[in-house]
Amino acid sequence: MVPVVALVGRPNVGKSTLFNRLTRTRDALVADFPGLTRDRKYGRAEIEGREFICIDTGGIDGTEDGVETRMAEQSLLAIEEADVVLFMVDARAGLMPADEAIAKHLRSREKPTFLVANKTDGLDPDQAVVDFYALGLGEIHPIAASHGRGVLSLLEHVLLPWMDDVAPQEEVDEDAEYWAKLAAEENGEEEPEDDFNPQDLPIKLAIVGRPNVGKSTLTNRILGEDRVVVYDMPGTTRDSIYIPMERDEREYVLIDTAGVRKRGKVTDAVEKFSVIKTLQAIEDANVVMLVIDAREGISDQDLSLLGFILNSGRSLVIVVNKWDGLTQEVKEQVKETLDFRLGFIDFARVHFISALHGSGVGNLFESVREAYDSSTRRVSTAMLTRIMAMAVEDHQPPLVRGRRVKLKYAHAGGYNPPIVVIHGNQVKDLPDSYKRYLMNYFRKSLDVMGTPIRIQFKEGENPYANKRNTLTPTQMRKRKRLIKHIKKSK
């Protein structure tokens, strides 16, 4: 069993900075701003070949109000999930009442807890941590997470010994029989070729949209638990939260993202980081659910976000949330507006749901699987070339400078999104209308749904281009006589 380590403490004591150090990523947003982390964030970490799961949490200070109450609940849930807790305090700020309250809660839970004093850079560590002995949690481990000082010592002298006590590493008996068996395996038959199948990989599903359209509510509804903070206030989610899950014997990684507003309205530095994280999550995903608020309709910002999704080549499912409570007349108006403004993406499934009450949510994953399967389906060169030939037979390419564009053959150039590469002569002169015709023909023939198709054209090289023939001596003499004859006739 992989041990779980939770990082807890007051806001802005450096939990996310240490999380990034331990996981060797920049997955957690970091800024000198209390309350930046709002949800539990999970990451894999390793020390001397031993893996453990690290949980970054929001801060607890005992004065929570509004959305901060939900943040504190997430932190308390992380403590329950963890096998061991790293309780972080701020050495510069000194001992605070909230530190004492957290220590009291940890003692009541009887969890293995190690006290970590952060921000000791530039201070005398021994003097900086004296006050924290009053918490009664034993030895204090001084670190400077932002510079990495003391982090390795924390791992080697605290976490590793604890892991050895809880789950000792199995030692291999290195006897003659073991080495003989290993040598026999190495000299035996070669391993069969790896038969890569994208269906065996988890589907990365990003849930995106404008602020407060119900993304986190939908995430919790799908998971069946309050996994992320939900609050009726735009900007509740600030980071992209990656959550592994399984549904109908298929593995997924659910990505709950921060809302994206118009660029002119994004003034807060933290929100700018959040938007970047959301756009990165879109590029990292296989399938994107774009959530639209039925009561506000589709906005220019929705279309802008949609354009980024399509340019990234991601598969798409459109989710119209807050459908409950609307009159039939309003529903018809919303559908007409969607048909008008989203007519250019007729390949994407549209679902009308209520994330709050759960209506329509169960049907989403059928479209997600359909989109992913379409985007990763392997198609042979023979089939693609045959489809291309049928398209040409139904509608010939246009004439360019008196010569008809010739398409020779087609093959797959990539997946997720599907890319079809067509080779031919003068293909760079094909008009956009014919390119769209080919794209739609391939989509219809391959029965592709939920994902964009990209067509790339490659020009056949002319071996005689930019080359001049070298005349033989006989040809040279003949040329001279011809030139002399022309001059005389003049």
From Swiss-Prot:
It comes from the Bacteria. GTP 2 binds at residues 209-216, 256-260, 321-324. Residues 3-166, 203-376 form the EngA-type G domain. The keyword GTP-binding applies. Residues 377-461 form the KH-like domain. GO terms for molecular function: GTP binding; ribosome binding. Associates with the 50S ribosomal subunit. GTPase that plays an essential role in the late steps of ribosome biogenesis. This is GTPase Der. It comes from Citrobacter koseri (strain ATCC BAA-895 / CDC 4225-83 / SGSC4696).
